[in-house]
């Protein structure tokens, strides 16, 4: 996976990026999930915007069989959606 700085710089929503960056260890698992989603988007050549992050997280949520991982993905999705409400 890419470095945290690269991941945060790739996110077009700077408020969302700042929120995760300033959360420290509080959102460590959620940051890892977000980082994986951003990395996947970057590697596939897609734009790293809230819409694509949301779609990536939904896909991850739909395809995981791990209940604990699904909970972390859901929490990450809720955070991203909170920062996207104005865009809808």
UniProtKB/Swiss-Prot annotation:
The UniProt entry, under InterPro entries, shows: AriR
Provide the GO biological process annotations. Answer: cellular response to acidic pH
Q: Which Pfam families match?
A: YmgB
Bilayer-spanning residue ranges:
none
Q: Name one GO molecular function term.
A: DNA binding
User: Keywords in UniProt for this one?
Assistant: DNA-binding
Q: What does this protein do?
A: Regulates expression of genes involved in acid-resistance and biofilm formation. May be a non-specific DNA-binding protein that binds genes and/or intergenic regions via a geometric recognition.
Q: Describe the protein's quaternary organization and the partners it interacts with.
A: Homodimer.
- Official protein name in the record: Regulatory protein AriR
Into which family does the record put it?
Answer: Belongs to the AriR family.
Under Gene3D superfamilies, the record lists: 1.20.5.5260
